[in-house]
């Protein structure tokens, strides 16, 4: 089950039907990862810079907003409460402009990125980064979204 809290109402001005949008991205990703049948409970909070900065400081001691924060709670199992994903519209909008990509594409990428983190993927080491980015690229491709790392590689 996907629980979505639109904490920051400006999401409604930027993404049409944000709850449906998020559910589609997460459910499609769970299916493509072959874990949909586990029916994990995932909470997603569509937030702003203020909330992400508070959480980033509280949990990571970084006093600045960030695009996505993930909090894994349990290992994947049937009907487990897998974790929470928080994303900041403010950061995503700025990054979308800087990257010259649609906000929907960047939001999809950050949702998938957050999902992979609550599934215990990380990008601290080069091999782990390669694995995580490869999965992100594959899942985004299934959604018709181009590789977000291409511009960094060329």
From Swiss-Prot:
One of the GO biological process terms: rRNA processing
Entries under InterPro entries matching the protein: MetalPrtase_cat_dom_sf_prd (IPR023091), YbeY (IPR002036)
Compartments, record wording: Cytoplasm
Binding site for Zn(2+): 113, 117, 123
A GO term, aspect molecular function: zinc ion binding
Cofactors: Zn(2+)
Cited function: Single strand-specific metallo-endoribonuclease involved in late-stage 70S ribosome quality control and in maturation of the 3' terminus of the 16S rRNA.
Protein name: Endoribonuclease YbeY
Cofactor-binding details, from the entry: Binds 1 zinc ion.
Entry keyword Hydrolase: yes
Enzyme Commission identifier(s): 3.1.-.-
Main location (coarse class): cytoplasm
HAMAP family (alphabetical): Endoribonucl_YbeY
Keywords linked to the UniProt accession: Cytoplasm, Endonuclease, Hydrolase, Metal-binding, Nuclease, Ribosome biogenesis, rRNA processing, Zinc
Cellular component annotations (GO), alphabetically ordered: cytoplasm
UniProt cross-references to Pfam families, sorted A to Z: YbeY
Gene3D superfamilies: Metalloproteases ('zincins'), catalytic domain (3.40.390.30)
Family statement: Belongs to the endoribonuclease YbeY family.
């Amino acid at each position: 089950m996907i629980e979505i809290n639109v904490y920051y109402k400006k999401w409604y001005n930027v993404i049409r039907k944000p709850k449906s949008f998020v559910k589609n991205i997460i459910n499609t990703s769970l299916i493509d990862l072959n874990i949909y049948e586990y029916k994990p409970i995932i909470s997603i909070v569509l937030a702003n810079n203020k909330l992400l900065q508070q959480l980033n400081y509280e949990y990571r001691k970084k006093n600045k907003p960030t695009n996505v924060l993930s909090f894994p709670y349990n290992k994947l199992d049937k009907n487990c409460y897998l974790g929470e994903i928080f994303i900041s519209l403010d950061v995503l909008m700025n990054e979308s402009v800087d990257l010259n990509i649609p906000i929907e594409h960047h939001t999809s990428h950050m949702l998938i990125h957050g999902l992979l983190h609550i599934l215990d993927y990380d990008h601290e080491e080069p091999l782990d980064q390669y694995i995580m980015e490869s999965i992100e690229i594959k899942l985004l491709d299934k959604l018709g979204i181009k590789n977000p790392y291409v511009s960094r590689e060329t």
